[in-house]
């Protein structure tokens, strides 16, 4: 795989990406000096490239779940799950600061909105219960 303009891979992990319709897709998340790449592990093809300069913020809950959202105002957002969520977000913050001297906003909240597609906004909320952490989605 050729990452044009990128000099090094800073982080890689297997993630679950949630589509606008709520389906889960396995993806390989690759973070380089300048972009996020999502790779389909079955076809080994790139499904999406997002320049880090386009990322406004990363949202994650205050609970010990695996969910996070990457907010991209010029496109639809990414809602994903990773067992290495905290590490992934920290590396994104560090890489963004190094590449552009910009402090990437990290929103810690048990409720936030994201654009699941060009025309669909979803609100996700996280709640701790006796059974574990409950995740709820609401179409806006």
Region roles according to the model:
Residues 1-27, 31-140:
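Eukaryotic phosphoinositide-binding membrane-targeting regions
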């Amino acid at each position: 795989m050729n990452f044009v303009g990128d000099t090094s891979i800073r982080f890689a992990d297997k993630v679950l990406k949630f589509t606008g319709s709520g389906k889960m897709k396995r993806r390989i998340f690759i973070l380089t000096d300048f972009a996020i790449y999502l790779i389909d592990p079955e076809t080994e093809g790139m499904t999406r490239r997002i320049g880090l300069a386009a990322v406004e913020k990363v949202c994650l809950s205050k609970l010990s779940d695996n969910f996070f959202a990457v907010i991209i105002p010029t496109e639809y957002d990414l809602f994903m799950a990773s067992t290495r969520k905290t590490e992934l977000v920290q590396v994104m913050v560090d890489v963004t600061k190094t590449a552009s001297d910009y402090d990437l906003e990290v929103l810690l909240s048990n409720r936030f909105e994201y654009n699941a597609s060009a025309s669909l906004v979803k609100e996700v909320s996280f709640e701790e219960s006796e059974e574990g952490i409950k995740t709820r989605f609401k179409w806006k």
